[in-house]
Structures are given as C-alpha cells and as structure tokens.
Regions:
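Second-shell loop/turn segments in exported
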Residues: 195, 243, 261-267, 418-425, ...
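Flavin (FAD/FMN)-binding glycine-rich loop and adjacent Rossmann-like elements that form
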Residues: 181-185, 229, 292, 304-307, ...
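Conserved N-terminal/central alpha/beta ligand/cofactor-binding core
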Residues: 209, 215-216, 221-301, 344, ...
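N-terminal Rossmann-fold NAD(P) dinucleotide-binding loop
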Residues: 203
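Extracytoplasmic
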Residues: 30-186
Length: 602
C-alpha cells in the first residue's frame, strides 16, 4: 500500500493526538473523587445540605451530642493498585483554639495516621493526608467519628500525582464534581405552568391552590420533609390567626396543613404532621413533588425566568424544570437572587422609608436563627464535661433550662444571616453545649440525671433577604392602617422584632445568642396588606410568598409567622392561575384583572 507524504503527515498528527488523549485519560483514570453524601452506608452520620450555596456541597455530619457516632462506610473501585496521595475536604468548625469535630479515616482496614477536623482553621479546604497503598481494586473506606461533636467531611480525593490543584470555590467544585463523577449536564423534567421553589407553608399552599384550579405544578423542596420551619426538622409550630381575614376564603388550605397545636420542640414528631402534609400533596394529581432538590441556577430570557436547575442532594444529579410562572417560597429569596431580582437586606434607614422605628442609618442587623433542643430525665447520672471550644458560662451567667425557648437565636448583624449561616448554626451549638456542660458540671444534684437527647442541626431563620415588589410594605402602612385597593392578606400578629439581649451583650459582646422582643400589640393588630407585595418589580414572571416578600425590616415583624405566609401562598396560587388564564404577568393582573382576583378570594 502506498501513502503520500501528506497522508503520512496526517497520520502522524492523528497518532500524536491519540497519544495525548491517552495521556489525559490516564491522568484522569489515576484519580478518584468520593463525595461523602454518596457513601453506601451513612452509619450515624447525617447528610447536611443547608449550606450548599456557601460551601459548595452537601456533606456528612457526625451529630452525636457528645457521643461518637457509628462509622460511615462505602466501597470504592480504584482504576489500579499502587500508592495514592490523599486529600480530604473538611474544616475545624470551632477553632477556639482547636475544635471538637475530629475524625479519622480507615482504608481497607488500616487507619490513616492523620486526625481531621482539628486544624485550627475554620474555613472549608482540602487537607493533604499523606499516602496510602491500595492493594485491592475494590476497597472499603470508613469515616470514624472520635467525639460526637459535629465532625464534618465533604469529599475525599485520591491521586497518583503528588501535586493537585483542587478547586475550593462553589462553581469550581461543581465543575470538578461533574467531570470526576461523569455527571450529565441535566435531566429534563418537563415544562410546568407553575414552578414553586420552597416547601414551607407558603410553598405548600401556593402549590395546592394552583393545582386545585387546574395548573400543572412542580413543587421543589430542598428538604426531605415538607413544612419548612414548622416541620419536624425545625419544630416551630405555625402561628398567627386564620379566622380574622378580610377575605374569609383565604386560610382554608392553611387550615388543612396547620400544626399550631404542636408547640415549640415537641418530642412527639407526629404533632408536626409531616406525613399528613405529604399525603395531601401526593393526593393532588396536578402537583409533581420533588424532594431533596436544591435549586442553584436559573435560565433567563431577558427579565423572565425560563427554567431552574436543581441538584438532587442524594445523587448530585441536576434536573431542569421549565415553567411559565415561578414562585420564590424559599424564605431566603434564593430564586429571586439567582434571577437578578431587586432585593433588600438588614434595616432600612429612616430617610429611606420614613418609618418612625427605623434607625438613622441603614445597617445589617437582622433577627436571628435558632436551633431547637431538649434534654430528658433518665435513671442514671451522666457527664457532659466543659470543653475549651464551648462558650463559657459562670455562676453569674447561665440558664437553668432543659429545653430550648424562643429567644435563643444568633445573627443580629454580628453574622450575615445567609452567607454565615453555617457559622451561625455552629455558634448556637457552642452556646447550647456550653450552657449544658455548665449545668451538668456545677449543678449536678439538679441536672445529673438529665441527658441531652435532641439538638436539631437544621437551623430555623426568622429573616434573610427580601425581594422588592411594586409596593414595599412599611411600618407606617401597618400602624396607620393604610388601605390599598389590592389589600388581600390579613396579618394579625403585630410588629414583632428581636434584638440582642443587653445582659447577653455584656457577657458575650459581638457573640450574642439571646434575644429580647419588642412586640407591643401581639395578636391584636390586624392589617390587610396588598397583593403588590407578592411579586417582583423587575422579574416579569416571579411571585414570592413567605418571609422574603416585599416588606421593610420593621414590617417583616408583622407578616413573618407561618399561618400568614401560608395565606400568602394561597393568594399567589390563585394569582398564578389567573395569570395563566389571561396570559398576563403578575403586574398586569393587578392593572387589568384585579377585581377578578378579589372575586376569587371573596
């Protein structure tokens, strides 16, 4: 066979390219990424997915309340045997000076000579942990908790190369994960009339209302249970009134899912009605429910949302949901922020809002975040030693409690309520563990037989970002009973705002975790606020319901309780139906079809 010089040249180029390609494949095949949330057996470790937007991923948490939890285990298939370098992505969550979240890793029955979680560095990062010889292509890996005090591990990376530049930012980690785990760009879940993001009371009510009016609805929730703050994960019951509305029809769906009788941090989980709420949703033929799905990206056409992308926290696969109308019921305004919606954070100044109670200068103060807990009385005495990383209590300042109360909360402008959400949760841990250790150590006669039985690692927020609508509800509106033509949802709670407790500030300046409330008209101040607070002023097809609607910081104090947010959801569900009926935007519904909306709720 005869080849021309040109053919030979082309063949050489192809051969060289093939060698380069093989080289790249070899490099890739000589490394292994393990995401801990994909471990086959979690043991006593839990998947914590609250902080994906801040640190990049769900992770495993060893939340044992001071008692080491059972190992998490998985089997890993290596591309070849030999020596591998190891990196582990973790953090020291309480480096004061070094934290308690220590754990070890066991590979093929051999424990690494490296303790993780006590580096003295509070940031998430990759830690190089030496080398290991892999003799079996299929090898067992174990995470062994040493303390029961919230060790955490995000990912493990093995490489034949001694030097790796591993990403640590959210976007970089997502691309790295996609490449290493060979994840598809997305799986398409179809097009919906109405896409509701967030499965708290607002999201549930919005989805049910729209579905019962005939819309095809996707309800996307990033938790395994429905209910948000009122679920068994957070145990804050619903509050506010459902029978004093200007329009009595509003509140009927909220009454179906209500759990205000449960009380704060009830030990009986069934009181929070997780299963009942799930049953109601599953019985709605027009609702497709997607649990454990975290929305992290949107697709836009100008100022309209076309679709949202959500990551399944149990598989890390991405699913795409197209829609005509969207509702942000996330509480944190997550969907609104992703889409570029105008938003507010912290306290507005008196000059900005004209409110009598506003500060002279705007600031970042917000109401705080809480973690519920309780202890139970046992038959035997147990210890809970004071440790250096805990907040330190004294005879002069401690709290004799066996259960959480409403005013244990962290935030207040000392921490950013969203960006520092993991730090806030961990600060609550340090306060709760520290006070409990003081009681168990110095008041043993009274608390010796009590045992810390429950502390939620899921944190419940009161405030975060708020999206701006065509009307920004203010303190003046509520106090002066300003009557808007589109007044539609009645709040009965009164303006309830939380601030750092002054005595707590004296003992823990800048680290407050106790609040006091200003709530002069509790349950006595009815006010019906307008529909125009429930849609974005600059994103054409975005509704919102929940604590992230268009209100000032002060006005938020009146509308944030969960029966009220559920009623917002009902209105948004009706409005979404009318928008589909008339092929109009939420704003056009106000300008052109307001009377029909009011007729719907009458």
């Amino acid at each position: 066979m005869c080849f021309s010089k040109m053919n030979i040249c082309v063949m050489k180029i192809i051969f060289i390219f093939f060698l380069l390609l093989c080289s790249l494949v070899t490099v890739s095949s000589q490394s292994v990424l393990i995401e801990t949330e994909l471990f086959e057996t979690k043991g006593g470790w839990s998947i914590d997915s609250q902080f994906i937007d801040q640190m990049g991923s769900p992770y495993l948490l060893a939340h044992g309340l001071g008692e080491a939890v059972e190992d998490a285990t998985t089997e890993v298939r290596f591309p070849e045997t030999g020596v591998y370098y190891i990196w582990v992505r973790t953090k020291d969550w309480a480096p004061y000076p070094k934290g308690p979240g220590r754990f070890r890793m066991i590979i093929d029955g051999k424990e690494l000579d490296h303790t993780f979680g006590a580096s003295g560095d509070i940031e998430w990062k990759w830690y190089k942990a030496g080398t290991v010889r892999i003799d079996n292509l299929v090898t067992e890996i174990r995470l062994r908790d040493l303390t029961g005090f919230d060790a955490r591990c995000d990912a493990i990376f093995f490489s034949k190369s001694a030097e790796e530049n591993l990403p640590n930012d959210v976007d970089g980690l997502r691309l790295f994960r996609k490449k290493m785990l060979k994840l598809k760009d997305f799986y398409y879940e179809g097009e919906y009339d109405f896409v509701v993001v967030g499965g708290g009371t607002a999201g549930i009510c919005a989805a049910i209302q729209a579905a019962r009016l005939g819309l095809k609805v996707a309800l996307i929730n990033n938790r395994s249970v429905l209910g948000g703050n009122s679920s068994s994960e957070l145990r804050i019951p619903t509050d506010g009134e459902l029978f004093r509305n200007k329009y009595p029809k509003i509140g009927s769906i909220m009454r179906e899912i209500d759990n205000g009788f449960a009380g704060v941090c009830n030990e009986n989980l069934s009181m929070y009605r997780d299963n009942w709420r799930l049953k109601i949703i599953n019985n709605e033929k027009n609702i497709s429910l997607f649990r454990n799905m975290h929305v992290y990206a949107v697709g836009m056409s100008g100022i309209k949302i076309d679709y949202v992308d959500a990551m399944d926290i149990n598989t890390l696969k991405t699913y795409r949901f197209s829609g005509k109308i969207f509702a942000d019921c996330t509480g944190d305004a997550s969907l609104g922020l992703l889409s570029g919606a105008d938003h507010l954070y912290g306290r507005e100044s008196k000059a900005q809002t004209g409110e009598a109670g506003a500060p002279e200068e705007s600031d970042s103060l917000t109401m705080g975040t809480s973690n519920q807990w309780y202890a139970t009385l046992t038959d035997s005495i147990s210890a809970f030693p004071i440790e250096e990383w805990m907040l330190q209590f004294t005879e002069d300042y401690h709290f004799e409690l066996t259960k959480s109360v409403w005013n244990w909360e962290t935030g207040f402008g000392n921490f950013h309520i969203v960006e520092d959400s993991e730090l806030i949760r961990d600060h609550n841990f340090r306060a709760i563990y520290g006070n409990w250790a003081y009681l168990k150590t110095y008041l043993r006669d009274k608390y010796g037989k009590y045992k810390l039985a429950y502390l939620s690692y899921n944190a419940g927020k009161r405030e975060s970002y708020r999206l701006v609508g065509d009307v920004l509800l203010t303190e003046t509106d509520i106090r002066c009973k300003v009557n808007y033509p589109d007044a539609i949802v009645t709040t009965t709670w009164g303006i309830d705002l939380h601030y750092p407790d002054k005595q707590n500030s004296r003992y823990f300046p800048g680290q407050e975790f106790i609040a006091y409330a200003i709530h002069p008209n509790k349950r006595k101040e009815d006010y019906t606020f307008p529909y125009r607070c429930l849609y974005s002023r600059n994103i054409e097809n975005l509704f919102m319901a929940g604590r992230n609607i268009s209100v000032t910081h002060i006005a938020l104090g009146a509308i944030r309780v969960q029966r009220t947010t559920g009623m917002m959801g009902e209105v948004v569900g009706m409005a979404a139906y009318l928008c589909m009926k008339y092929r109009c935007s939420p704003r056009q519904l106000y300008t052109d079809y307001l009377q029909e909306l009011l007729d719907c709720v009458s």
